Amino acid sequence: MTTPATVLQRVTVHTVTSKDTLEAHPVELPDYERGRFDDIAFMTAMNLCLMGNYAQTGHFGGPLAYTPYNVACHLAGPDLGGLRYDLRNPKFPYSDKFMLSGGHNIPTCYALWMILYEALRQQHVATGDDRFAVDPNVAILPIDALGFRRG
């Protein structure tokens, strides 16, 4: 169940001090569209499972565990601690750099990027608006998954 975006959540985060005692820190979570994040995370998880099953490879525990983090980093925006970047120009020198350690976890990135690039592609086709145009040599599209670890 997701929390409505209009509700400001209050949570308590506990940290362990150097004296092995717990300290409580009340934190207010800002409003954001959690339902949309959950939807994209679900689609990303399903996409990476489909890719892995098609390629007959791997174990999905790592990538599935990283999926919510990956989605939040890419979609939250800098005001909520996310990346400052433009998906249409991923090599822009002044955008934030994204590195996910653990090479086996990269499928979550591929799965998310496919969803985001496909959304841009479909929006460009539907509207003709060049703001949604992406160079197909830069984009990672679903058709690209056919060659992942296959063969």
Model-derived segments and their meaning:
Residues M1-A72:
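Conserved acidic/glycine
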Residues L64-G151:
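Cofactor-binding active-site loop characterized by glycine-rich and histidine/acidic residues
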